[in-house]
Amino acid sequence: MRRLLLSALTLLGLSLLSSVHSQSLSIENVHVDIANRDTVASTVPITFDVTWSGSWREGESWDAAWLFAKFEREPGVWADLRLVPSSGSVSGTVPATLELSVLPAGYANGIVLHRAEEGRGEVQFTARASWTYGASYYDLPRDGVPIRVLGVEIARVAGGPFEVGEAIVDSLRQPNAFRSAGGGAYTVASEEEIRVSDGPSALYYDVPEGEAYAGGDQAGPVPGSFPKGTEPFYIMKYPVTQGQYADFLSLLPARARAARDITAYATYADEGGTITCDEHGCTAHNPDRAAHFLSWADGIGWASWAGLRPMSELEYEKAAAGTPAERSRYADGDLPDRVGTSERRSIWGVVDLRGGLWERVVTVGSPQGRAFRGTPGLGFVDDLGHPYAFSNLDWPGPRAVGSGYRGGTEGLLGLSEVTDRTYGAYEATYGNAGQGFRAVIDEP
């Protein structure tokens, strides 16, 4: 069975070479206002322009940009840029809201920028914030320092209860799918602890004998601290792209870059990989193509560096299927005409949550997964490109214990239904052509 599983996870990447998404986020005119720096508070204003097309806001659903920055602390060494929490402002072509994501240490490591009113179409904004360089124990030179502002498009998943699994006869239920004791869908009503058992008012899932390594241990409870999706959160519209991953590699020290380099896989270029690296950095020749061959360690390294976090498998079902009133079995209401030929959007505007690259999630099916508390990435990694050991102790570590797979593809094995948990607790350390990564962040 394990051999078949490994083959399936590898072969599912073969139909994904056309997974290219039209991402339009542009960040330009980055300016550090050295003339107005505050040498007492060790802060300095920064401004930059942000543009993207296809923006929307309707009711409780809208898209946004997650923006974060790095500065060149010394030649070739880039560090996370920290912001004063109360310093943000924005102007633009439409009314906008700028929210800073504040970490427990008291500084912000990124910005969520979105429309303030309903509407659709391209948006252009000028964002302003104050860089607290003193928080990095850094003395800003009089002539300034190079900085990079980076970003990803994200979509808001509204708060509220939702269902996991589906009301269906056992013979048609997806493998290892969540259910209630009576066999119907289970309602996740709040962030409170969830009891796991085949009894009343509990969450359960059936796993064939001997396959707990893939489907989960059927144990619990799921703690109140485990992110469940009933509170609002933002999720990346698209998986990490090759352009975004190339930026990550380029701004890492040499040892960390080598550890997180995905281009050494023998079939990388043949399977659609376009990232190349040299002593000056890395370049993606097709930057909008989804980054594949990402292992769990690669994904959490990128998420930590970007100030984001992995998603739980409950958050995956909320983002993919929606609320009970708008629930979709396939995350877009129907199957596409042909695999890889059209973007599938969930009701929240999230693209290809099923039928594309496998989504890596934190599982409820192991003690290590259930220990996840959803702490945010701090914006930096260690010398192997991993989240620092002291910073995200709740995350499944580089060995992937506590992780799993959701989403799949109908291209080979028909594993694309949102409720399918065939590999919901499978802890794979490797990367291959069928694996990408998508991160989330709690609403500020």
Locate predicted features.
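Bacterial N-terminal signal peptides
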Residues: 7-16
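Short coil-to-beta strand junction motifs in C2/discoidin
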Residues: 58-67
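Functional-site microenvironments in short loops/helix caps that host divalent-cation chemistry
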Residues: 284-398
